[in-house]
Each structure stands twice: as structure tokens, then as C-alpha cells.
UniProtKB/Swiss-Prot annotation:
One of its GO terms (biological process) is cellular response to amino acid stimulus. InterPro entries: LAMTOR2-like, Roadblock/LAMTOR2_dom. It comes from Methanocaldococcus jannaschii (strain ATCC 43067 / DSM 2661 / JAL-1 / JCM 10045 / NBRC 100440) (Methanococcus jannaschii). This is Uncharacterized protein MJ0714. GO terms for molecular function: guanyl-nucleotide exchange factor activity; molecular adaptor activity. To M.jannaschii MJ0310 and MJ1340.
């Protein structure tokens, strides 16, 4: 039930211009829900995103920043953005030219909806 509700949020998020796909992973790296393109290994991306977000949280804490809001990995062909979603991490894959302001607002709203489901 919760998974199908999360899938609806992800499908809505995926309609944002520049978004290639999205998923929610547990802090342990296990996939909770995924709406990624077929050529993307959700299990692998979920595990790696969880590890990257966890490392960013630890780094943020170590240097005195409180409450990590977002982590972004930027490459030549796109970006991977991660935000805290309560019991999970919202991961969004985008193209290189995505409007970061728009995607950040859209992700915040989606993460708030997902947090309310747990």
C-alpha cells in the first residue's frame, strides 16, 4: 500500500522537465520504490546512493553543519540528487541541463509527502 503511494509520488516527480527517473531507498540501501529507466540497475544505484548520502551526512556532522538537506553528484551527462525522506532517501536522476531551483523545490515537496507516509 505505502509502496504504491510512493510510486505515485515518484511518477509525478518524473514528469518534471529534465528528470530521468527517481527512487526511494532505505538508509540501509534497500530499494523501497523505484521509477527508474529500464537500463538503470535500481539495486546498485540504491546501494550506492545510500552510501553516498550516509557519507555526506557524516561529513556534514563532522564539520559542524547541522541537518544535511541535499547531496548532489554532478557528471557530464547528468546529476543525481538525494534528499532525506524520513525513513528513506529520495534519489532523483536528471539530465545535465535540469533547472536546479525547480528540481529542489519539487524534490522537497515529494520528500515531505513521502515522510508523511511512514
Amino acid at each position: 500500500m505505502v509502496e504504491s503511494m510512493i510510486d505515485r509520488v515518484l511518477l509525478e516527480l518524473n514528469r518534471t522537465d529534465g528528470v530521468k527517473g527517481s527512487m526511494v531507498v532505505g538508509k540501509d540501501g534497500l530499494v523501497i520504490a523505484s521509477q527508474l529507466p529500464g537500463n538503470v540497475d535500481a539495486e546498485l544505484v540504491g546501494a550506492m546512493a545510500s552510501a553516498a548520502f550516509g557519507a555526506a551526512e557524516r561529513t556534514s556532522s563532522e564539520i559542524g553543519l547541522s541537518g544535511l538537506e541535499q547531496t548532489m553528484i554532478e557528471g557530464e551527462h547528468g546529476k543525481t540528487l538525494m534528499v532525506d525522506a524520513g525513513e528513506g532517501i529520495l534519489v532523483v536522476l536528471t539530465d545535465a541541463k535540469v533547472n536546479l531551483g525547480l528540481i529542489r523545490i519539487t524534490m522537497k515537496r515529494a520528500a515531505d509527502k513521502i515522510k508523511a507516509m511512514f
